[in-house]
Amino acid sequence: MDHLVKIIEKKYEKKEIPDFRPGDTVRVHVKVIEGDRERTQVFEGIVIAKRGSGINKTFTVRRIGSHGVGVERIFPVHSPVVEKIEVVRKGKVRRAKLYYLRNVRGKIRIKERRD
């Protein structure tokens, strides 16, 4: 049974996913359908968490929206709604989950990682 699930999941996995980690700044291109027309919306922010495995893998992106309000979105990595993921900047952090950034006020500075 487990073997059959893996075969079906393999069919829906995306191939062109860039390597990114928590702390990286990413630009996610999301397909939005409004009525009869379709457009691409860009959401740029810091990856604060990655979770799951296989086709159920998700990542959380946080950015500071208008009026200083924090906005977080959870994206499934293999979703057909996510058109493209671009890594804008690689961040150097020592945690897998950056939930502490929710409580930080002002400009968040994360050092840049040099690979």
From Swiss-Prot:
Keywords, sorted A to Z: Ribonucleoprotein, Ribosomal protein
Pfam families with a match to the protein in the record: Ribosomal_L19
InterPro entries on file: Ribosomal_bL19, Ribosomal_bL19_CS, Ribosomal_bL19_sf, Translation_prot_SH3-like_sf
SUPFAM superfamilies: Translation proteins SH3-like domain (SSF50104)
GO BP annotation list: translation
GO molecular function annotations of the record: structural constituent of ribosome
GO CC terms: cytosolic large ribosomal subunit
Function: This protein is located at the 30S-50S ribosomal subunit interface and may play a role in the structure and function of the aminoacyl-tRNA binding site.
Similarity field: Belongs to the bacterial ribosomal protein bL19 family.
PANTHER family referenced in this protein's UniProt entry, alphabetically: LARGE RIBOSOMAL SUBUNIT PROTEIN BL19M, RIBOSOMAL PROTEIN L19
Descriptive protein name: Large ribosomal subunit protein bL19
Organism the protein comes from: Thermotoga maritima (strain ATCC 43589 / DSM 3109 / JCM 10099 / NBRC 100826 / MSB8)
Lineage start: Bacteria, Thermotogati, Thermotogota, Thermotogae, Thermotogales
